[in-house]
């Protein structure tokens, strides 16, 4: 029986920022007999395939208690299951916690990270540590992983593109009529939505058309 272990921050189909992870897990479900997910937070998961099993950490626990529970949960799962590999999505801390367990069980670790990098000093240290501990790093582009220079083995970094179902978003447009406009995005400072709104208002369409912003914060 082929199984895979996934570590992520959130499993919630209704979350505007991380809800896409559901499609990733369902894609794994087609390739593996069982997909075991360890998530820091769990929301709506009714869209998951039946062979995707999600375990989450109690959000009411303190930070140290969460780390201990996470370690014990990963240790328990890896002891009772044989995994093809373990994928950690955007969580440096989870790959650091899991690393000694995965090494002991001889399970390959893969770390997905696509971001300019954290501003917080401690999170920078976590990211550098995770980059060293993991067996492989996958990212969207050659510029989407910030700490290439710290890698002990440059060949562990693999550029695979964004994991997006392009066909679901592509629609051929033969002509364009001036209608209302929409921005679909996570609501955060890094997305510079204020600049987009300002640009729209100052454009020739700004006085005669409506702009809607659809999205939500990361947390």
Task: Annotate the PLM regions.
Residues 39-44, 132-170:
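A short, active-site helix/loop in glycosyltransferases that binds the activated sugar's phosphate group
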Residues 5-6, 173-191, 197-201, 211-217:
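Conserved donor-binding/catalytic core segment of Leloir-type glycosyltransferases
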Residues 70, 83-107, 117-124:
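An aromatic- and histidine-rich active-site surface loop
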Residues 8, 37-39, 161, 210-215:
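Short beta-strand segments
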Residues 30-69, 73-80:
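Conserved nucleotide-sugar phosphate-binding/catalytic loop shared by glycosyltransferases and other
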